[in-house]
């Protein structure tokens, strides 16, 4: 475990000795869980290399984490069951309907406080594709806020304001798919093999037809089937939901590492809770409905472990699909 922690050293040099030691202790505590989760990839050397990369991701985020969020981490470590406190009271809303935009939340926070709200879920907040976007769940950029709601600075300000009033901010994080216009998909369409491998693409209908023998249709009326032909890819791409929502290949460790970075970047803006949207669909297995496969739990475990190392105040909430 010390070898894993050593990969973090170059990113922690600017921190105090106490803060560096705290990170190393967390790596030592959670490394076994991380490696067990990464065993999902079926190759010990690959799991180890992925763990090293994730520790580096965690170290960079930890070093950049604001002091007030480090303080929140310390408080949450002292009360690990904080979210199960009977006083916790959640409220979910569409930002534009409730407050107009992120800046408008400050005008409504007194109302939330009177209700006793301690947990605010803003649906969906990240930048979607233009046009049809599945109600905002076809994300074009996970690092940008919907332009009509504000920007990253507005998100940081809103999270800080809410936290000061005792309210934890929750946002949706779509894990199964990205919009066709996402930078990864655009690179894949442009011929970049690295990003093509982020998706499930097939040259002909042989494999898609075999999968579809047991796959239910999510939107049979207006988005039948689970695969879409794309001329630029010259292949059939897996699209569980809509033809503009491309499923990611979570058997590729690079996808896991990308989302670890996204989660920690948003956590450093003050997001405390992530609702993991469409998480049941992450792992594909021939002959099944490709939902709630055991590997999904291991992938979630790996992501959760990275958060526990870099930002232990963060909580995951998985969408249940049964």
Language-model segments: what does each one mean?
Residues 274-278:
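Extended, hydrophobic alpha-helical segments in both membrane/secreted and soluble proteins
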Residues 1-257, 268, 279-322:
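Acidic/aromatic-lined carbohydrate-recognition and catalytic surfaces
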């Amino acid at each position: 475990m010390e070898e894993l922690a050593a990969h973090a050293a170059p990113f922690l040099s600017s921190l105090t000795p106490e803060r560096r030691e705290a990170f190393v202790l967390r790596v030592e505590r959670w490394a076994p869980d991380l490696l067990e989760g990464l065993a999902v990839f079926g190759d010990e050397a690959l799991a180890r290399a992925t763990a090293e990369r994730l520790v580096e991701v965690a170290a960079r985020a930890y070093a950049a984490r604001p002091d007030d969020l480090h303080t929140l981490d310390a408080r949450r470590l002292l009360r690990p069951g904080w979210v199960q406190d009977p006083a916790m009271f959640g409220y979910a809303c569409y930002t534009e309907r409730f407050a107009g935009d992120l800046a408008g939340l400050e005008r409504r926070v007194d109302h939330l406080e009177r209700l006793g709200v301690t947990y605010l879920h803003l649906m969906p907040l990240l930048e979607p594709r233009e046009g049809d976007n599945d109600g905002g769940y076809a994300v074009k950029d996970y690092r940008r806020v919907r332009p009509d709601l504000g920007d990253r600075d507005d998100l940081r300000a809103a999270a800080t304001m809410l936290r000061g009033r005792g309210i934890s901010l929750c946002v949706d994080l779509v894990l199964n798919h990205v919009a066709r216009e996402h930078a990864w998909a655009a690179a894949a369409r442009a011929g970049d093999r690295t990003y093509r491998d982020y998706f499930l693409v097939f040259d002909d209908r042989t494999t898609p037809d075999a999968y579809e023998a047991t796959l239910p249709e999510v939107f049979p009326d207006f988005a039948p089937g689970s695969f879409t032909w794309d001329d630029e890819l010259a292949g059939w791409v897996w699209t569980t939901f809509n033809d503009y929502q491309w499923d990611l290949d979570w058997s590729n460790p690079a996808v896991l590492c990308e989302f670890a970075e996204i989660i920690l970047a948003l956590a450093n803006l003050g997001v405390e809770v992530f609702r993991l949207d469409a998480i049941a669909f992450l792992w594909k297995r021939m002959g099944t409905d490709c939902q709630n496969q055991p590997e999904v739990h291991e992938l979630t475990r790996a992501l959760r472990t990275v958060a526990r190392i870099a930002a232990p105040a963060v909580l995951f909430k998985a969408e249940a699909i049964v």
